[in-house]
A protein has these predicted regions:
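Helix-loop-helix hairpin linking two adjacent transmembrane segments in secondary transporters
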Residues: 2-43
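Helix-to-loop junctions at the C-terminal end of transmembrane segments
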Residues: 19, 118-132, 218
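C-terminal membrane-cytosol helix-exit motif in multi-pass small-molecule transporters
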Residues: 32-51, 240-245
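Short amphipathic helix-loop junctions that connect adjacent transmembrane helices
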Residues: 88-104
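A late C-terminal transmembrane helix in Major Facilitator Superfamily
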Residues: 186-220
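C-terminal transmembrane helical hairpin of 12-TM major facilitator-type secondary transporters
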Residues: 133-179
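Pair of pore-lining "gating" transmembrane helices in MFS-fold secondary transporters
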Residues: 66-86, 166, 170
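Juxtamembrane intracellular "pre-TM" segments in multi-pass secondary transporters
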Residues: 45-75
């Protein structure tokens, strides 16, 4: 999860620089090249034999999808839905408030990303050391809601936008790191691969629906309506996490 967060942060920094140098078409060619490199890396991996084979069936899915794991799947779906929907309009918000030019977005993202990594460390430590993962996740969802409210209502300058973006990234990076860790400790060992597959599918479905719905809302209504949508999703998610059982098969919270 942490590596995914780092990759996303790097894309925010490098993307505007590449597009300013070679244009939007060059940016997509760069993405295609990186995809080919990724495929070569996957093909170069040694195939390891599974410890135990099991037949994929409806019963395997039903046994894997416990209440706890469904909550985690919905959590990663919601996180990436909020991310994708928010960043459909984030560049427009920056331009409308004349914070920085499109080519200089990295001036804003770089300090926010650096500060967010510093801010997430104590949250991760508290979560792991004191077994308070659920409550740290709820705190981070609250921070997501706070950041969306500021983006929605505030008259933004560079300083306020930087602080708000840092709050958003602290919450996002913390959740992105904690959810896969919690999933691996919650799922049964023999069905962990299936659980991780469903989890990853939920993540990318969240990205797809976030981009599609966020773009549709912006097209029909306006920029602020997108943030109202992400706030609505985050509030439902917060209550869903509140109802999540404290005890799981592999992890107990005290």
């Amino acid at each position: 999860g942490f590596q995914i967060g780092v990759a996303f942060m790097l894309s925010l920094l490098i993307g505007p620089i590449i597009s300013s140098k070679v244009g939007l078409q060059g940016l997509f060619w760069t993405i295609a090249l990186l995809s080919l490199i990724s495929m070569l890396l996957v093909f170069s991996l040694n195939q390891s034999k599974p410890i135990r084979y099991y037949r994929l069936s409806i019963s395997a899915f039903s046994e894997t999808l416990t209440k706890e794991l469904i909550t985690l799947d919905l959590s990663i779906f919601s996180l990436h839905l909020i991310l994708a929907a928010g960043f459909i309009v984030m560049p427009l918000l920056i331009v409308e408030n004349q914070i920085v030019s499109m080519a200089e977005n990295w001036h804003l993202y770089l300090p926010a990303i650096f500060l967010s990594f510093l801010g997430m460390l104590p949250l991760i430590v508290i979560s792991e050391k004191f077994k308070k993962t659920k409550y740290i996740l709820m705190l981070c969802i609250s921070l997501l809601i706070l950041s969306q409210l500021i983006f929605l209502n505030a008259s933004l300058n560079f300083q306020l936008f930087l602080v708000t973006l840092t709050i958003f990234f602290i919450a996002f990076n913390s959740i992105e790191a904690l959810l896969p860790s919690l999933l691996s400790r919650t799922a049964d060992t023999e069905k962990r691969g299936l659980a991780m597959g469903i989890f990853s599918t939920s993540q990318f479905l969240g990205t797809f629906f976030g981009g599609a719905i966020g773009g549709l809302i912006y097209d029909i209504y306006d920029l602020n309506s997108v943030f109202l949508f992400t706030i609505f999703v985050a509030i439902i998610w917060w209550f869903l996490m509140l109802l999540m059982p404290l005890k799981t098969k592999k992890l107990k919270e005290k």
